[in-house]
Amino acid sequence: MQKIQSNQIQEQDLTPELKKWLYASGSLTQQLTDLADGLFTVEPIQEKYQRMSFMDSRWMRMPAYHVAWVRESLLYGCEQQPWVKAKSIFPVLSLQKKARIFKHIGKKPIGRFLFQRTTPLCERRVIRLEEGWTRQSCYTWHGCKFIVQETFLASFEQYIQHHSHSI
Protein backbone atom coordinates (compact mmCIF):
# COMPACT_ATOMS: atom_id res chain seq x y z
CA MET A 1 0.00 0.00 0.00
CA GLN A 2 1.60 3.23 -1.14
CA LYS A 3 1.36 6.27 1.09
CA ILE A 4 2.11 9.89 0.31
CA GLN A 5 2.52 12.11 3.35
CA SER A 6 0.56 15.37 3.44
CA ASN A 7 3.69 17.49 3.06
CA GLN A 8 4.21 15.85 -0.35
CA ILE A 9 0.64 16.47 -1.51
CA GLN A 10 0.31 19.01 -4.28
CA GLU A 11 -2.67 21.35 -3.96
CA GLN A 12 -3.62 20.78 -7.61
CA ASP A 13 -4.01 17.04 -6.93
CA LEU A 14 -6.92 17.65 -4.57
CA THR A 15 -10.33 19.04 -5.55
CA PRO A 16 -11.67 21.86 -3.36
CA GLU A 17 -14.80 19.79 -2.62
CA LEU A 18 -12.84 16.82 -1.30
CA LYS A 19 -10.35 18.99 0.57
CA LYS A 20 -13.23 20.29 2.73
CA TRP A 21 -14.09 16.71 3.70
CA LEU A 22 -10.51 15.67 4.41
CA TYR A 23 -9.91 18.55 6.79
CA ALA A 24 -13.37 18.81 8.39
CA SER A 25 -13.58 18.40 12.14
CA GLY A 26 -16.30 16.61 14.03
CA SER A 27 -18.19 13.43 13.22
CA LEU A 28 -17.84 12.10 9.67
CA THR A 29 -20.80 9.84 10.50
CA GLN A 30 -23.02 12.87 11.07
CA GLN A 31 -21.66 14.75 8.06
CA LEU A 32 -22.28 11.80 5.70
CA THR A 33 -25.74 11.25 7.19
CA ASP A 34 -26.57 14.92 6.56
CA LEU A 35 -25.23 14.75 2.99
CA ALA A 36 -27.30 11.63 2.26
CA ASP A 37 -30.52 13.09 3.73
CA GLY A 38 -30.51 10.68 6.66
CA LEU A 39 -29.45 7.57 4.78
CA PHE A 40 -26.29 6.04 6.20
CA THR A 41 -25.19 2.45 6.72
CA VAL A 42 -22.08 0.66 7.90
CA GLU A 43 -21.06 -2.69 6.43
CA PRO A 44 -18.32 -4.36 8.49
CA ILE A 45 -15.83 -6.15 6.24
CA GLN A 46 -13.48 -7.65 8.78
CA GLU A 47 -12.62 -7.50 12.47
CA LYS A 48 -9.48 -9.13 13.82
CA TYR A 49 -6.46 -8.84 16.08
CA GLN A 50 -3.19 -7.97 14.39
CA ARG A 51 0.11 -6.30 15.10
CA MET A 52 0.13 -2.56 14.55
CA SER A 53 2.45 -1.16 11.92
CA PHE A 54 5.60 0.52 13.16
CA MET A 55 4.32 3.91 11.94
CA ASP A 56 0.95 3.55 13.72
CA SER A 57 2.64 2.37 16.92
CA ARG A 58 4.97 5.35 16.81
CA TRP A 59 2.16 7.82 16.09
CA MET A 60 0.22 6.58 19.12
CA ARG A 61 3.39 6.44 21.24
CA MET A 62 2.86 2.72 21.83
CA PRO A 63 5.45 -0.08 21.97
CA ALA A 64 6.57 -1.09 18.47
CA TYR A 65 4.28 -3.62 16.84
CA HIS A 66 1.80 -3.60 19.71
CA VAL A 67 -1.25 -5.84 19.17
CA ALA A 68 -4.48 -4.10 18.22
CA TRP A 69 -8.04 -4.99 17.34
CA VAL A 70 -8.71 -3.75 13.80
CA ARG A 71 -12.16 -3.10 12.35
CA GLU A 72 -12.58 -2.47 8.63
CA SER A 73 -15.89 -1.41 7.15
CA LEU A 74 -17.53 0.32 4.21
CA LEU A 75 -19.69 3.40 4.76
CA TYR A 76 -22.65 4.00 2.47
CA GLY A 77 -24.70 7.12 1.91
CA CYS A 78 -27.65 7.38 -0.47
CA GLU A 79 -26.07 5.34 -3.28
CA GLN A 80 -25.41 1.65 -3.86
CA GLN A 81 -21.66 2.20 -4.07
CA PRO A 82 -19.70 2.70 -0.84
CA TRP A 83 -18.45 6.22 -0.21
CA VAL A 84 -15.78 5.57 2.41
CA LYS A 85 -13.57 2.68 3.45
CA ALA A 86 -12.95 2.95 7.18
CA LYS A 87 -10.31 1.24 9.27
CA SER A 88 -10.15 1.60 13.04
CA ILE A 89 -7.14 0.48 15.06
CA PHE A 90 -7.68 -0.06 18.79
CA PRO A 91 -4.56 -1.07 20.76
CA VAL A 92 -5.21 -3.84 23.28
CA LEU A 93 -4.38 -1.39 26.08
CA SER A 94 -7.30 0.83 24.98
CA LEU A 95 -9.64 -2.16 24.83
CA GLN A 96 -8.95 -2.75 28.53
CA LYS A 97 -10.47 0.67 29.20
CA LYS A 98 -13.59 2.48 28.02
CA ALA A 99 -12.79 1.87 24.32
CA ARG A 100 -13.83 -1.77 24.78
CA ILE A 101 -17.37 -0.72 23.74
CA PHE A 102 -16.14 -0.27 20.15
CA LYS A 103 -15.40 -3.97 19.89
CA HIS A 104 -19.10 -4.82 20.15
CA ILE A 105 -20.90 -2.19 18.05
CA GLY A 106 -21.50 -4.35 14.97
CA LYS A 107 -23.05 -2.27 12.18
CA LYS A 108 -23.25 0.88 14.26
CA PRO A 109 -20.88 3.71 13.29
CA ILE A 110 -18.00 4.49 15.64
CA GLY A 111 -18.78 8.20 15.32
CA ARG A 112 -22.11 7.80 17.11
CA PHE A 113 -20.25 6.77 20.26
CA LEU A 114 -17.08 8.79 19.80
CA PHE A 115 -18.80 12.18 19.54
CA GLN A 116 -21.67 11.52 21.95
CA ARG A 117 -21.48 14.24 24.62
CA THR A 118 -17.74 14.69 24.04
CA THR A 119 -15.19 16.14 21.66
CA PRO A 120 -12.12 13.89 21.74
CA LEU A 121 -8.60 15.20 21.21
CA CYS A 122 -7.53 14.54 17.65
CA GLU A 123 -4.28 14.60 15.69
CA ARG A 124 -4.83 14.31 11.94
CA ARG A 125 -2.79 13.58 8.86
CA VAL A 126 -3.88 13.37 5.23
CA ILE A 127 -2.32 10.85 2.86
CA ARG A 128 -2.98 9.45 -0.58
CA LEU A 129 -3.49 5.67 -0.73
CA GLU A 130 -4.07 3.61 -3.86
CA GLU A 131 -7.81 3.57 -3.09
CA GLY A 132 -8.10 7.32 -2.65
CA TRP A 133 -7.48 10.33 -0.44
CA THR A 134 -7.38 9.34 3.19
CA ARG A 135 -7.56 11.12 6.50
CA GLN A 136 -6.07 9.40 9.51
CA SER A 137 -7.10 10.60 12.93
CA CYS A 138 -5.40 9.61 16.16
CA TYR A 139 -7.98 10.15 18.90
CA THR A 140 -7.57 10.36 22.64
CA TRP A 141 -10.98 9.55 24.11
CA HIS A 142 -11.49 8.99 27.85
CA GLY A 143 -7.77 8.20 28.20
CA CYS A 144 -7.80 5.71 25.29
CA LYS A 145 -5.77 6.21 22.11
CA PHE A 146 -6.82 4.78 18.75
CA ILE A 147 -6.66 5.54 15.04
CA VAL A 148 -9.58 5.97 12.67
CA GLN A 149 -8.63 5.96 9.00
CA GLU A 150 -11.20 7.10 6.41
CA THR A 151 -10.48 6.66 2.70
CA PHE A 152 -12.82 8.62 0.44
CA LEU A 153 -13.58 6.37 -2.52
CA ALA A 154 -14.03 7.46 -6.15
CA SER A 155 -17.83 7.10 -5.89
CA PHE A 156 -17.89 9.71 -3.10
CA GLU A 157 -15.71 12.13 -5.05
CA GLN A 158 -18.07 11.81 -8.03
CA TYR A 159 -21.12 12.36 -5.82
CA ILE A 160 -19.83 15.53 -4.18
CA GLN A 161 -18.68 16.97 -7.51
CA HIS A 162 -22.16 16.48 -8.99
CA HIS A 163 -24.10 17.54 -5.90
CA SER A 164 -21.89 20.40 -4.63
CA HIS A 165 -23.01 20.07 -1.00
CA SER A 166 -20.82 21.63 1.60
CA ILE A 167 -20.20 20.46 5.12
Curated annotation (Swiss-Prot):
Task: Please give the InterPro entries that the UniProt record associates with this protein.
Answer: Chorismate--pyruvate_lyase, Chorismate_lyase_/UTRA_dom_sf
Q: In which pathway does it act?
A: Cofactor biosynthesis; ubiquinone biosynthesis
Enzyme Commission number, as recorded? 4.1.3.40
Q: Which GO terms describe its cellular component?
A: cytosol
Q: Name one GO molecular function term.
A: chorismate lyase activity
Q: Which Gene3D superfamilies match?
A: Chorismate lyase-like
Q: List the disulfide bonds.
A: none
For this protein, what reaction is catalysed?
Answer: chorismate = 4-hydroxybenzoate + pyruvate
Could you tell me the keywords of this UniProt record?
Answer: Cytoplasm, Lyase, Pyruvate, Ubiquinone biosynthesis
Task: List localization entries.
Answer: Cytoplasm
Q: Does the keyword Iron apply?
A: no
Locate the residues binding substrate: 71, 110, 150
* Job description of the protein: Removes the pyruvyl group from chorismate, with concomitant aromatization of the ring, to provide 4-hydroxybenzoate (4HB) for the ubiquinone pathway.
| UniProt record similarity statement | Belongs to the UbiC family.
Protein name stated in the entry: Probable chorismate pyruvate-lyase
- Its gene name is ubiC
